[in-house]
Structure formats: C-alpha cells, structure tokens
Amino acid sequence: METRTEDGGLTRRPTLASSWDVAGGALTHSLLLTRAGLGPGDFDWEELLAPPAPGQDLVILKRNHNNKDENPCFLYLRCGPDGGEEIASIGILSSARNMEVYLGEEYCGTSRGKNVCTVLDDSEHEKIILYKKNLKLESSTHACKIKLLSFGERQCVFISKVVVHMRSVFANSSTSSPALGSRIDLDKVQTIMESMGSKLSPGAQQLMDMVRCQQRNCIPIGEQLQSVLGNSGYKHMIGLQSSSTLGTLNKSSSTPFPFRTGLTSGNVTENLQTYIDKSTQLPGGENSTKLDECKVMPQNHSFLENDLKNAMASFLPKKVSDNSNIPNSELLPFLQNLCSQVNHLHVGNKTECQENITKHGERILGVGMEEQSICSYLEKILSKNMELMEKKLMDYIDQRIHELQEHIDDKIALLLDLLQNPNSPPTGIPLRHYDSGERLSNGER
C-alpha cells in the first residue's frame, strides 16, 4: 500500500510504502518532512523523535500470512526524479529496535535504536516499547529502502514517526557523475584484508594510497594516471590551469616505470630546479619564436614554478613546501616520475615543433581514449578484487559458524545423554579412579 505526505511546505511530496500490510492507521500520518534548507546540524533528532502524545494512534504493519516466506519488513521512500529534492537523512520512531538502509541493493548503513518510551496499544492490548534511530546518508538519493529489524519473529511492527530530511538539488548536480573511485570505501577494503590476515603488496598499497588521495582531494584520477604513466610534466601542469588543454604523450614511450627508478632525498631540490630551468629555456637563443610557434611552454619562470608546487600539493595528501619535512615515501612516487620525465625531456628544433602541432588533434584523441580505457580497467580490477575479498570473508564466516554449530550440537547431545542417564558416565569422559582404602591380603592396596 502506497501513501503520500500532505506537507504543503514541499512542492514534490515523496512517497512512502511498506512491504507488509497496513493493518491500522496510515503511513501518511507518520511521515514528517524537514525543510530542504536545513542542514543536518540545524535540527535536533531528540526533538523530532520525541515520544508520541498521549492518545496518538500508531501505524500497525502486519506480516502477510499468505506469504510463506519469512520476508522482513521494508519501508520504501521515493522522491520524484524531477522534484529538485533528495533524501539526506532518515529517522524512525517504531517498535523495531534497529534499521538498515539500502540504496537499491547496495547496503548503506545500520542504526541501532535507543529506548524512548513504552506505550499501551488499545487494539493489541499490550505494552509497546518504542525505539528511536536515525541515519545520515553519505550521499543524498532519490529513493531508498529501510529494513526494520526486531528480535524474535515479530508478526507486526508499530510505527509512530518517520522523519525524512530533504536536501535541495541543483540542476547541474544530477548530470555530474561522481569521480572515479569515490564509490569505493578503501577503509572497508583495508579492514576486510586485515580480518583475513592478508597484506597488500607494495604496488597494491601504492595504488590504494593514490586512490585514497584522489578521493580526499577530489582530483580526477585520469590526471594522476597520465602523470604516472609518462605524460610530460609541464603539459600536465598546464592542463591543471586550463581544463580545455590536454597534454600530449611523451615520445619516449619506453620510459621506465617511475616507481622502479632510484631517487635520493639529496637531489630532489636539484632535479626540480633543473626541470624548471629546462622548461623555460630553449637552445639557440630562439626562445620567443619557438614559444610562439609551439604554444606549449609557459613564458614566466615564477608562473611555472607556482604551477609545479600546486601540482605537487594536489597530488600529495600533505602540502608541499620548501621547509616541510615530508617522509621520502610520500614524495617518492611523484618526484621519481618528475625526474624521469626531466631526463627524457628533449626539446627539438622547429620542424619537430611543427610536427607536434600537426599531430596535436590526433594525440589529444589518443590521450582521451587511453585515459578512459585505463580508468575503466582500473575500476574493474578494484571492483573484482573487492568482490573476491568479500566472498572469501563470507566463506570464512560461514565456515566458523558451521564449526560453532557443530560444537554446540555436540555439547547439547552430551548434556541430553547425561540428563537421561544420570548414573552412567557420559561417553568420551574418562572414568575417575576411586580408592576405597581397603588393603589386600598381601598388604598391597
């Protein structure tokens, strides 16, 4: 049975439905909406999920007895896709102790209820304990389902309030897709790996650190992959300044993978300065003409140096400065890549620049296609590894539960045998040695 709210403050009213039959009351009366302009900290859940007023009727959801399957009770919340609002957080006051929230089939989170009050239900003539629980969604959504959980096989659930916090959605936010990797919870992956007793290889750990840095700084991971896989450093930094300009691939496609080359902390500053000097000067004193023809190299030394610092600050989780004591392990991947590009950076003559300009369109297309294929391949690998780790973890849990069940069954069987035959020792227990203290005729005991 589907119902709608009657709150006039919102132009697009969300719908609320239940997988169980509504035996008493209406879900419309239990749904309370908060205005979209409020933030999660601007309202008090204690007040919104306060005990109901005396005499207030509760909504009763009953299990369908015609359905033999033991389906749990689900609540379905849905907003119109063109309503301009999304669900940001949910709170429920009901007899169900806990609730789980799902976005489609994807688990979102669990909220454990707190005892609020005890009310007397006139229809059932029993005391009902109401629990309050609330959950803030990591990302707002147009639709979600709520699983109500209770101890024991409850045949009905009493609902007092369903509080939904709505958030305004801008027109451009619906068309923008989330950054690659933002949907992957790396902390969860790390926890699963540690629980299985596994450790990440150095390469996998570097990849995870790079994705975590991208999630934290909201940097398109394609730019990081282009930098790591051999894009020229100065064109990568120009791409940071103008999103419409893409760097071309370095001619030296056989450049060693940056993580395999050696780098010491003593020559970091020297390599950076060398890179800046080479990037701002062309041989033969033809700086102005070749810069105009190629339209690639920046004309200002300080401008390029600032771009270099900004690129490093955006790539690393910590701010890069001249006096910062950042561990070498954090600077190593980016600086190795930068220095390897400096060693293979050769500025050609005028004909080479003209050739670069002629093939500029083809290389831009190649960069875009390669970035797309690399990002797609990386996402598939991460998703496959997460599914594999989750399957191994579930198999391990099932095995442990099975062993525990067998152990409990053995103990119960032993206890029942002992109760049925109290005088006979149970099977598997060695007999105790009793000494009567009597001596034999030969004096031995």
Swiss-Prot record:
Residues 426-445 are annotated as: Disordered. The modification Phosphoserine is found at residues 177, 182, 254, 302. Transmembrane segments: none annotated. It comes from Homo sapiens. PROSITE patterns: ABC_TRANSPORTER_1 (PS00211). This is ATPase PAAT. ATPase that regulates mitochondrial ABC transporters ABCB7, ABCB8/MITOSUR and ABCB10. Regulates mitochondrial ferric concentration and heme biosynthesis and plays a role in the maintenance of mitochondrial homeostasis and cell survival. GO terms for molecular function: ATP hydrolysis activity; identical protein binding. It comes from the Eukaryota.
